[in-house]
């Protein structure tokens, strides 16, 4: 099958190359799926997409997928089933996928998901040096039916625009009046040259001049009103576009965040700004610039049709400039946004890990990495700016040449007494009101190109379904027993992290899960709060499958306190009350901080509960952060608490006091701990090794068994 250029798909984020390659093959057979959907089907992780993931996704969409390890002899076959996907180590540095669209004796033709490369050819020598040999061949099954997923174009923003129609109308009216005043000023110049000066009409000149001055004052008032309304419009559009993105981000499942770098998510805010800029510019161009072009075009035609026809000759040149620069701007905008996302991720990562960087004395090493990424971003941004500057220079040259031709031809008409000098000067003055709006419309190309790329990137987030899409009624429970039946879980299509877990936890039981690092302890408890869905098996609470619960209700019933408690910017009181009921009393707050053994620490601070904290709470010790987070969890209405290494930063004495307090509570508490002193005090201990429950019992029972737990305890 011949690969068509229209089927090319570029990757949006760093780890999208596998899904983008799959998308190209699917398009060749009439199926269109967003990269967001393909990431879900292929089990893409933060490390990228595996060949197995692409195989599973293809099979799920009605294809037979063969994964083979081939060599150079593949291209010597008479019938090679193009296009196919090849796994490569690009530039001998990082794993990547190409779509192979054809080959000849010396070259291999590829479609590279990298938007800076797109469709090109490589010498066979270069390709074979990169190719790992792994190749994926897709062919439709007899029952295959093409499917097309709906994605939002820039037209989807029309409802947002129409909501602001009153503001837009006022901006257009103000701009229209301002332009009319400027046109009147041009005719004043014509009358002055052709009538008032030759005929010495001093009185008329004075009256007209004063009138024009007053008109210009009104014009500036309208200019201010227009600028004010533009700011209002910009802010309202920002609320609609940026806040809706943030709202959607908060509603996405944990799997979305675990498979993307932070910078890839935050860089979409600047993408949204590009869309806002394009929307605002498009509104003004559609409603104002087009109107002014038509109006001034009519006036210029009435002024002198020969000169006006000369002006119209420049428009095809502008159109040619747009067509030439369109693919260039698309590619360069993609690259600028992608390098910006990588840079943002690194900066956020390094600021969050600054303590570790300083502890390892690796400031220079991390700086050099950011320096390299920043240089890459600047290089791409500079290339884009150069292209924009070249386009601007071409447009300006066309405009200047046009002005010279107008004056040249117009002067000839004046010499032949076909028009007056005043008419020529007025025509030249009015010309800017015709060409400037055309220039504004042409300038939309760059903004709309950037906005289209930005919209594609936003779509990849918007197309990830919210975890709250299904409206579920709150369920009433007669008891709070937890039961896990044959639970297995794996990230993407990698190895199983959990395998056939069977576990029952009674209401008010105090249970500790132990095991070496990487055994699956944290993953198991995250399934209990629906952060991730089990690959197989069921989990019930009160006899009801967790999938039937509204997630907000479930997380109010089961509170998970992660290994790294997060303290938010605000006061200690703000942090304590996050997630608590609005009716929480002072007595309940005091009770919670006492149970967490943090009351004395807080009350010794100068501002007590009103002490302001930054997001990293650098003024607090690790143990204080953990205890504030624990008090916050205790203030939640949860019947079940999951404490993932929640006391790991505490001294043994404080930890023992807190454990004693927690064991006395009328709640189910699940501890995850490396310190076996926590396990000793709990009712039951579950030992996990390589994703399986291998032992269960009390501390004394497990020691008596002399198994894995006993080894951990004695060692």
From Swiss-Prot:
Question: What is the protein name given in its UniProt record?
Answer: Lactococcin transport/processing ATP-binding protein LcnC-like
Could you tell me which species this protein originates from? Lactococcus lactis subsp. lactis (strain IL1403)
Query: Where does the ABC transmembrane type-1 domain lie?
Result: 168-450
**Positions annotated to bind ATP:** 515-522
Q: Where this protein primarily resides, as one coarse class?
A: membrane
Q: What does this protein do?
A: Involved in the export process of a bacteriocin lactococcin.
What GO MF terms are annotated? ABC-type bacteriocin transporter activity; ATP binding; ATP hydrolysis activity; ATPase-coupled lipid transmembrane transporter activity; cysteine-type peptidase activity
- Annotated membrane topology: Multi-pass membrane protein
